[in-house]
Amino acid sequence: MMMDEDVEQATLVSYSDKPRTFPDMRSKTYSPLIIRILRNLNVRALSVLLLLSFGGIFYMGARTSPIIVFVFVVCIISFMLSVYLTKWVLAKDEGPPEMVQISDAIRDGAEGFLRTQYGTISKMAFLLAFVILCIYLFRNLTPQQEASGLGRTMSAYITVAAFLLGALCSGIAGYVGMWVSVRANVRVSSAARRSAREALQIAVRAGGFSALVVVGMAVIGIAILYSTFYVWLDVDSPGSMKVTDLPLLLVGYGFGASFVALFAQLGGGIYTKGADVGADLVGKVEHGIPEDDPRNPAVIADLVGDNVGDCAARGADLFESIAAEIISAMILGGTMAQKCKIEDPSGFILFPLVVHSFDLVISSIGILSIKGTRNASVKSPVEDPMVVLQKGYSLTIILAVLTFGASTRWLLYTEQAPSAWLNFFMCGLVGIITAYVFVWISRYYTDYKYEPVRTLALASSTGHGTNIIAGVSLGLESTALPVLVISVAIISAFWLGNTSGLIDEKGNPTGGLFGTAVATMGMLSTAAYVLTMDMFGPIADNAGGIVEMSQQPESVREITDVLDAVGNTTKATTKGFAIGSAALASFLLFSAYMDEVSAFANVSFKEVDIAIPEVFIGGLLGAMLIFLFSAWACAAVGRTAQEVVNEVRRQFIERPGIMDYKEKPDYGRCVAIVASSALREMIKPGALAIISPIAVGFVFRILGYYTGQPLLGAKVVAAMLMFATVCGILMALFLNTAGGAWDNAKKYIETGALGGKGSDSHKAAVTGDTVGDPFKDTAGPSIHVLIKMLATITLVMAPIFL
């Protein structure tokens, strides 16, 4: 079927619009304010600015610890490598003009939405920062802070500054993920015309750029805060704060990162899945046109959603995970060192920063190990990209074991317990093995090479209902193995830490919680490579859409289809990895919360008795919060999808020539509808997550005051946090796995199995996929952030619960 001249030239705009312009969005490429400022500086001024910045950073590092200097050096080198990867990717050709036109439209939509979304988030962040400032100006101080002369005003400004820096870095992490994705997609599409391996290499290196920046920013942001506070407060000098108490000042950074990540994930998830579901229901089910077909008015909105939902949101999510894990481990390391009277506690406090610095090194090696194949062509057999990615991951795992052993011997050796470092190294191995097992479990339940997804696809042959039943049962079943693995990991790491030989003044073992923290670090010790695999998914998905819309040969589409299917699996495995790390990190944050309450109340706070009615109610409220949050997130996608469906149907009715390529769809209208709806819908579930723990803690604090239970508010919040974490882990596992399985069952049928595209089995699978979309890309990932944000917000707000 021939297309008219305008469609052949890929003029993806409304009739009255200029190229690369969407209604209600913007008319020129958006760049953040800091980028625009840097562009206006000449090279000499920029060089001087960078030298002064680096000089200041290294000065503070040298005043703090040689370990901090090492962290700074590694982070800066990783940033330089990320610049190299960017230049390498951008040097690749963009392909023919029709590909470039489509890519420009996607980039405009993604950047325009992110500008509006981040503008909304920044306003809420400043409002919340003001609330935190007011609370901290009237809160109590810990005895250690009072002894060091740290007043309420200084403590308030420190926490607010940390919160805003965490929010800023989290926002940049998300923007970076989107920035590279919208520029790499067309280059992957172009490379797919030549060879599958070259396309794979470009997608991986583009994802690697984003991953290195995200992890590097999380590490260097905390390191800069730590060294700044260390120098400014003159830590460890007579009459000043002890270094073991310093990590408590960093909790605002974790809360800021969580705050931005939650709204980025909610807004991006609602956008991407609202557009995806709407496009699929009308395009595939009602009109039988292929995915990413240029006749579908919602296709550009769908492709934009891949970037703002999967790239920007996931970058902020992983940034927040790493920041929360580092801060909680630093708090626990400082607490343990203080109890054990370790002469130099800096190694135990800074150990998480060193582990993630090595993560940048080993993940870079893993990323660079994936190379193109010489003399390959589009006609060559398509090598399984998952095998290639798995080789890189295996190499990264091996290097992680070696560097983890070196780190523990360097930083965790103490004469009080000479073999303790070996026990903690074993804790790290537990975490590394847990990460590998989680990745394998996620692949097993979501890859169509294995039985669960094929069984789900077979259920599609008997109708829509059986597909839904099979998908729900698969998701429920998939929670069992991960929970068993997490349980074994926590118990093993706790036991290894407890038997490390580190004891307090009374002779009690004190290394258990820190052992669990080290296991969490082990699990996240390959986070940069795992994030690379995750970023690979949406880039490959976008590349496939560009190939389809630009009417490339079927052989090219076959390559991008393979990359897309693997990308779906890597996204699913990354979500499994993320929820596993979130589970361990939340356990650490819960322990850190109890330590902080003990410090503020100056009494022991080690147990939470759920036999107390008020405490049990707190647990129920925590469990309810997870279900209500998930319901509101899914409902938001449903309402957005309804608006898209109505708009697409309207265009098909009013412009019947669309199906025959005689009229052009109004892509911009769908983009504007989805963007507006996503920004509106993200507020309610986000506000629920932030307000609930604060309100519950404050109400029960008042109740405790009148009933003679001074710690009741803190206990109820602890129960709420505990139950929400447990329910959140299970709910996220169910939602992520069921959604990923539904998606890949559809893709398995699209390979030609069970009747192939257009068959009744395929239509049933599409229905399952639309149900699973908000599960795996909106509610599920948002719960990862939610359970960690609940922990960080309780850390920051702990004083008002007492």
From Swiss-Prot:
<keyword id="KW-1278">Translocase</keyword>
<feature type="binding site">
    <location>
        <position position="776"/>
    </location>
    <ligand>
        <name>substrate</name>
    </ligand>
</feature>
<feature type="transmembrane region" description="Helical">
    <location>
        <begin position="577"/>
        <end position="597"/>
    </location>
</feature>
<feature type="binding site">
    <location>
        <position position="273"/>
    </location>
    <ligand>
        <name>substrate</name>
    </ligand>
</feature>
<feature type="binding site">
    <location>
        <position position="306"/>
    </location>
    <ligand>
        <name>Mg(2+) 3</name>
    </ligand>
</feature>
<comment type="similarity">
    <text>Belongs to the H(+)-translocating pyrophosphatase (TC 3.A.10) family. K(+)-insensitive subfamily.</text>
</comment>
<feature type="transmembrane region" description="Helical">
    <location>
        <begin position="118"/>
        <end position="138"/>
    </location>
</feature>
<feature type="transmembrane region" description="Helical">
    <location>
        <begin position="782"/>
        <end position="802"/>
    </location>
</feature>
<feature type="transmembrane region" description="Helical">
    <location>
        <begin position="716"/>
        <end position="736"/>
    </location>
</feature>
<keyword id="KW-0406">Ion transport</keyword>
<keyword id="KW-0813">Transport</keyword>
<dbReference type="GO" id="GO:0009678">
    <property type="term" value="F:diphosphate hydrolysis-driven proton transmembrane transporter activity"/>
</dbReference>
<feature type="site" description="Important for proton transport">
    <location>
        <position position="788"/>
    </location>
</feature>
<keyword id="KW-0333">Golgi apparatus</keyword>
<dbReference type="InterPro" id="IPR004131">
    <property type="entry name" value="PPase-energised_H-pump"/>
</dbReference>
<feature type="transmembrane region" description="Helical">
    <location>
        <begin position="246"/>
        <end position="266"/>
    </location>
</feature>
<feature type="transmembrane region" description="Helical">
    <location>
        <begin position="348"/>
        <end position="368"/>
    </location>
</feature>
<feature type="binding site">
    <location>
        <position position="280"/>
    </location>
    <ligand>
        <name>Mg(2+) 1</name>
    </ligand>
</feature>
<feature type="binding site">
    <location>
        <position position="568"/>
    </location>
    <ligand>
        <name>Mg(2+) 4</name>
    </ligand>
</feature>
<feature type="site" description="Important for proton transport">
    <location>
        <position position="310"/>
    </location>
</feature>
<feature type="transmembrane region" description="Helical">
    <location>
        <begin position="686"/>
        <end position="706"/>
    </location>
</feature>
<feature type="transmembrane region" description="Helical">
    <location>
        <begin position="468"/>
        <end position="491"/>
    </location>
</feature>
<comment type="subunit">
    <text>Monomer.</text>
</comment>
<feature type="transmembrane region" description="Helical">
    <location>
        <begin position="421"/>
        <end position="441"/>
    </location>
</feature>
<feature type="binding site">
    <location>
        <position position="541"/>
    </location>
    <ligand>
        <name>Mg(2+) 3</name>
    </ligand>
</feature>
<feature type="transmembrane region" description="Helical">
    <location>
        <begin position="206"/>
        <end position="226"/>
    </location>
</feature>
<feature type="site" description="Important for proton transport">
    <location>
        <position position="777"/>
    </location>
</feature>
<feature type="binding site">
    <location>
        <position position="276"/>
    </location>
    <ligand>
        <name>Mg(2+) 1</name>
    </ligand>
</feature>
<keyword id="KW-0812">Transmembrane</keyword>
<feature type="transmembrane region" description="Helical">
    <location>
        <begin position="160"/>
        <end position="180"/>
    </location>
</feature>
<feature type="binding site">
    <location>
        <position position="276"/>
    </location>
    <ligand>
        <name>Mg(2+) 2</name>
    </ligand>
</feature>
<feature type="site" description="Important for proton transport">
    <location>
        <position position="317"/>
    </location>
</feature>
<feature type="transmembrane region" description="Helical">
    <location>
        <begin position="66"/>
        <end position="86"/>
    </location>
</feature>
<keyword id="KW-0460">Magnesium</keyword>
<protein>
    <recommendedName>
        <fullName>Pyrophosphate-energized membrane proton pump 3</fullName>
        <ecNumber>7.1.3.1</ecNumber>
    </recommendedName>
</protein>
<feature type="transmembrane region" description="Helical">
    <location>
        <begin position="41"/>
        <end position="61"/>
    </location>
</feature>
<feature type="binding site">
    <location>
        <position position="773"/>
    </location>
    <ligand>
        <name>Mg(2+) 2</name>
    </ligand>
</feature>
<keyword id="KW-0472">Membrane</keyword>
<keyword id="KW-0479">Metal-binding</keyword>
<dbReference type="GO" id="GO:0000139">
    <property type="term" value="C:Golgi membrane"/>
</dbReference>
<keyword id="KW-1133">Transmembrane helix</keyword>
<feature type="transmembrane region" description="Helical">
    <location>
        <begin position="386"/>
        <end position="406"/>
    </location>
</feature>
